[in-house]
Amino acid sequence: ADYAKNQENLFLLPEIAISSRGEVGSVLLFSKIPLKEISSVGLPSDSATSVKLLKFLLGERKLSPEYIEMGPDLDTMLEKCDSCLLIGDRALDASRKFPDLVKLDLGLEWKRVTGKPMVFGVFAARRDSSIDKIKSAHKALRDQLKKFEEDDNHRKEVIKVSSVKSSQPEKRLETYFGEVINRVDPEDMSGLRLFLKSACGMESEPSLAW
């Protein structure tokens, strides 16, 4: 969503992004009541993409609740609203701690509605940046991704460190890193184009750095 807003000044780096091809696990709508009955949604202020996606998906369900921006705390949000959107570690924590709440996984719902992967994050650079520096950074990212994909010991160490930093169980993070895709293909890019057009109102094609 931020890319769509600043598209004239940015281009996308190819091959890498943050995508899901079904469940994403870390972008969730939580509700005290059935989704078809919700009238208010608490929104965090830290993810424009997830907010745009949620509004699009609820619109596809013919729902038009009141949206209220507030701090990303589940208890506070559900005191004031029927439902709330959480992302990242907060979503993973809440899913584990409150299994009885109604949950909507936005990656899975996007897949159900469109049949496409959902790209939650992109790697972008300013159009006036040095192309050599961009290519160098892009190569470093791809090298790290390749190591994570192919080196089991490195992967386990990354998951272990991530578990300590996030307080998420290693087993859950192992699952999470399977739900989130970083090496994207043409189908992921097709999903990105659809999201930018349908949820963000971006009519032009996204521009790649090369």
Spans of model-derived segments:
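Short coil/turn segments
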Residues: 18-21, 32-34, 43-50, 115, ...
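Glycine/small-residue-rich interface belts in oligomeric ring/scaffold proteins
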Residues: 1-31
